[in-house]
Amino acid sequence: ARSVVAFAGDGCFLMNGQEFATAVQYALSIIVVVVDNGMYGTIRMHQERSYPGRVSGTSLVNPDFAALAVAFGGHGERVARSADFLPALERARASGKPATLHCIVSPDRISVGGSLAATRARATTP
């Protein structure tokens, strides 16, 4: 069996997280890394680019995704510091269950290479 690691934003996981129940039902070897910045990031990026500083309907109040994974019968851990990620990943792999790693990140960090502040600055610079 092949192991799978999936990366999902918090908004994405809120829309499709119920599929984790299927992963548990079929004992799939999957680890879902939920990157939680507390918003629908792509939509917010478009808002900042077109209407800097005007936020509408993109903020999220999220559940504890790690606890949700455990409630489904899987393995779940919350990761708040980068240094804690690799040990959590190893524990998830060793658990023998479908797993969710709930990673808390800065709301400004919109992608690996960009931030909301940089997007806003580009949009407001003539």
Task: Label every model-predicted segment.
Residues 1-126:
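Thiamine diphosphate
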